[in-house]
């Protein structure tokens, strides 16, 4: 018995094939530009209803591209808020490939132009740019430089620095500031300045006698008890001597002198190589007292001092004496320098205690009261 078409043989309606789990549908930019942007694509949508509460990157890029084609601007020039706000409106222009290609060509041309400009700039830097003036011109300009501006002048160029190394530069500087009424030691007088040996050091010392701005610096320096010198740390004691001072007091005072050599800045930075003067001017720049200073402590009576020459100065303290009228100075010397926050024990090293102390003074090598070296 033939059966007619029943409900089991009835044709089924066309079903839509669902994507497999774990795979995403391909995003087409034209879908976003045709008004298919939902509320779920925005950051202020309810995260309980929508899985993601942020704008999809593909949607944002497509909307910005469409706004760019409408406004004739680059995507980087359109704020993201304005681009997304305009995405909700229907797009009248769907095919804007011609305008996009033209804008891409203009962007490409600007990129090539910037690359050419940067290449030319690099060639100018690598090439010999600027003018190189003769040494005589720099020597002439150096005649108008103030003593406190010598460092800035020498940093202009190599020729300017070379001029500051010459004997002519330091001789002219001395003559420019010398006056007949200047009270100078014998080594700093004009007849002794004809020697090239240690000429630079002698001129600098003489400026602290004759040049008013330099002399004012010395008078403005505070007393040692008010500012404990920390620059002497890890300095090496080169020499020590004492002498009796006979003054207005009935009992004489004693002056203890410690000559230190400070740690070189190049050694601190572990950079041994530095800018050295030309060979023909080495005698002019010779200075036996370079980086040296003198610590002078005057006491009311004689105090026995142990041998500390050749040792490293690690600690300097000033406190009130037991009589509450004078100062008490404590010096600590070690066989090796102390680095970082390393702490010393009280029994380590050699301690020198001076009490009672009348005065404490610290002189750099250019100070007028600093004793001259016999080799200068």
Curated annotation (Swiss-Prot):
Q: What is its main location?
A: membrane
Q: Which domain of life is it from?
A: Eukaryota
User: How is this protein positioned relative to the membrane?
Assistant: Single-pass membrane protein
Q: State its location(s).
A: Membrane
Keywords linked to the UniProt accession: Membrane, Transmembrane, Transmembrane helix
The record's annotation in InterPro entries points to: F-box-like_dom_sf, TMEM183
**Transmembrane segments in this chain: where?**
300-320
Protein family according to the UniProt entry: Belongs to the TMEM183 family.
This chain's protein is named: Transmembrane protein 183
């Amino acid at each position: 018995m033939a059966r007619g078409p029943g409900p089991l043989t009835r044709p089924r309606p066309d079903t839509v094939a669902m994507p497999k789990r774990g795979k995403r549908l391909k995003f087409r930019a034209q879908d976003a530009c045709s008004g298919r942007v939902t509320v779920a694509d925005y950051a202020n949508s309810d995260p309980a209803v929508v899985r993601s509460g942020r704008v999809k990157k593909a949607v944002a890029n497509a909307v910005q591209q469409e706004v760019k084609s409408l406004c004739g601007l680059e995507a980087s020039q359109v704020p993201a808020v304005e681009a997304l706000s305009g995405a909700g409106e229907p797009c009248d222009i769907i095919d804007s490939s011609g305008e996009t290609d033209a804008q891409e060509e203009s962007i490409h041309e600007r990129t090539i132009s910037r690359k050419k400009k940067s290449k030319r700039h690099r060639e100018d830097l690598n090439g010999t740019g600027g003018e190189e003036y003769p040494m005589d011109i720099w020597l002439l300009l150096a005649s108008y430089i103030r003593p406190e501006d010598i460092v800035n002048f020498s940093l202009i160029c190599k020729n300017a620095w070379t001029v500051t190394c010459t004997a002519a530069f330091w001789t002219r500087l001395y003559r420019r500031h010398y006056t007949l009424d200047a009270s100078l030691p014998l080594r700093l007088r004009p007849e002794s300045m004809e020697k090239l040996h240690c000429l630079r050091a002698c001129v600098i010392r003489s400026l602290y006698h004759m040049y008013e701005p330099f002399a004012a610096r010395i008078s403005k320096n505070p007393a040692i008890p008010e500012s404990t010198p920390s620059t002497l740390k890890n300095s090496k004691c080169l020499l020590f001597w004492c002498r009796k001072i006979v003054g207005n007091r009935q009992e004489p005072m004693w002056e203890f002198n410690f000559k230190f050599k400070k740690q070189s800045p190049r050694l601190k930075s572990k950079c041994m190589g530095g800018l050295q003067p030309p060979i023909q001017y080495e005698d002019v720049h010779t200075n036996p007292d370079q980086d040296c200073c003198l610590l002078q402590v005057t006491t009311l009576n004689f105090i026995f001092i142990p041998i500390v020459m050749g040792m490293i100065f690690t600690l300097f303290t000033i406190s009130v004496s037991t009589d509450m009228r004078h100062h008490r100075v404590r010096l600590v010397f070690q066989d090796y320098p102390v680095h970082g926050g390393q702490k010393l024990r009280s029994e380590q090293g050699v301690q020198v205690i001076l009490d009672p102390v009348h005065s404490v003074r610290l002189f750099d090598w250019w100070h007028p009261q600093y004793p001259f070296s016999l080799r200068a």
